[in-house]
Regions:
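Short Pro-Cys-Gly-centered "Cys-loop" motif that presents a nucleophilic cysteine in a tight turn
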Residues: 1-82, 91-260
Length: 260
């Protein structure tokens, strides 16, 4: 551990102790997975390379995801498949559902992809990123996922991208058997969701989701984070940086040497 911190001190620009403490607070946690709670999940291709080149690749990936999520009891609330990365909103119903689904899906897809390429190699860049979402951030997270093609300038409206859950959420004629729609249907109508997507995202909303996904910390109210700390028996809220303050002497007697 000392060697790791020493290496971090050497490689981080020396702007002062506060910057170093900020880095430690932003460091990625061991993965936090909470059963029956929504999570945002994302993973990129190795070195941001294209890993989905055509519709055949997209159909193959989504079919593998469907099979694996059913096998490992993972509900899929939303998704967006891009050329070099994927975003998911999922609910794991067992402790291993999320990791097993991604491992199974991405392992099988890597074999499929490498079989089509002149040279085989790593397809996915490291392990996937994820963060738990409370109910108030679930829908903002789903909107962020479905607006990916709009932010990338590929379409003008989310529902125009056929390789995401937006098509099913915005068009009553589209049926997507991969999706768990019960919770969405209780909260939204097609017209209401279209309006919510069209309203767009705030910069703070996007920043918070990206930060929590990168670090693995839950995105939600302080009560939500505290409840997850009780459930997981782990510190999940960011720790305050800097050295702990020395306790102040309450009286002159506190400063006197002890005499037996």
């Amino acid at each position: 551990m000392r060697e790791a911190i020493a290496w971090q001190k050497r490689t981080i620009p020396r702007h002062g102790a506060n910057d170093f403490c900020y880095f430690l607070r932003m460091a990625r946690l061991p993965r936090v997975v909470v059963v029956d709670v929504a999570h945002h999940v994302t993973q990129r291709g190795n070195a941001r390379q294209v890993i989905v080149a055509d519709d055949s690749d997209r159909i193959t990936y989504l079919e593998l995801l469907r099979q694996s999520s059913e096998l490992y009891d993972l509900s899929l609330l939303g998704y967006c498949l891009m050329s070099n990365h994927v975003h998911l909103i999922v609910v794991p119903h067992t402790a291993g559902a999320m990791s097993q689904t991604l491992k199974h899906t991405h392992g099988r897809y890597a074999s499929y992809w490498n079989a089509r390429q002149p040279s085989a190699g790593h397809v996915w860049q490291g392990r996937f990123y994820s963060c738990p979402l409370d109910d108030s951030h679930l829908w903002a997270g789903l909107r962020y996922v479905e607006l990916n093609p709009v932010r990338a300038g590929m379409v003008s409206a989310a529902q125009e991208w056929p390789w995401s859950s937006a098509a099913a959420h915005c068009s009553p004629e589209v049926s997507d058997t991969m999706l768990a729609m019960e919770g969405w249907e209780k909260r939204w109508t097609v017209a209401g969701w279209r309006e919510y997507l069209a309203a767009g995202e705030s910069p703070s909303e996007v920043s918070a989701l990206r930060r929590c996904t990168h670090t693995g910390r839950p995105l939600g109210t302080s009560e939500f984070v505290a409840a997850l700390e009780q459930t997981t028996l782990r510190y999940l809220a960011p720790r305050k940086g800097g050295r702990p303050k020395k306790p102040a002497a309450n009286s002159r007697q506190d400063r006197l040497p002890f005499v037996a």
